Amino acid sequence: NTDQSFPGFPGSEMWNPNTDLSEDCLYLNVWIPTPKPKNATVMIWIYGGGFQTGTSSLPVYDGKFLARVERVIVVSVNYRVGALGFLALPGNPEAPGNLGLFDQQLALQWVQKNIAAFGGNPKSVTLFGESAGAGSVGLHL
């Protein structure tokens, strides 16, 4: 039982000096109800911010309460934002665009492969988000 969230992407929350940030941001936060469930529904949260700002490590996105009350596993995703996540230069392989969406896709694949070890059901996964996160959900469908 640890209570640790991982840092978001630099530049995403520069206005909030108390937010832990790092370029090494491709982490998931996972909250599991106690006792550990068997075959629980999984809810994956994608934060918003216009694809320019945001991080899943803000206290407002803590999934601990939702996991405990609803007996679900909550996963929040960090992804690259701003130019390093969404800059597109047509014809340039160095900046193909939408890397932030690929980060999210990697997180979804990780959940499919690994969530059973946490007591989750990979066949019962719900994506949800707000603002650009909700837009991301639509793009992954």
From Swiss-Prot:
The modification Phosphoserine is found at S131. Keywords: Disulfide bond, Glycoprotein, Hydrolase, Phosphoprotein, Secreted, Serine esterase. It is found in: Secreted. The active site is at S131. One of its GO terms (molecular function) is acetylcholinesterase activity. GO terms for cellular component: extracellular region. The keyword Phosphoprotein applies. SUPFAM superfamilies: alpha/beta-Hydrolases (SSF53474). Substrate binds at G49, G50. PROSITE patterns: CARBOXYLESTERASE_B_1, CARBOXYLESTERASE_B_2. Pfam families: COesterase. The keyword Phosphoprotein applies. Disulfide bonds: none annotated. Present in most cells except erythrocytes. Glycans are attached at N39. Its EC number is 3.1.1.8. Gene3D superfamilies: alpha/beta hydrolase. Homotetramer; disulfide-linked. Dimer of dimers. Belongs to the type-B carboxylesterase/lipase family. Esterase with broad substrate specificity. Contributes to the inactivation of the neurotransmitter acetylcholine. Can degrade neurotoxic organophosphate esters. PANTHER family: ACETYLCHOLINESTERASE, CHOLINESTERASE. This is Cholinesterase.
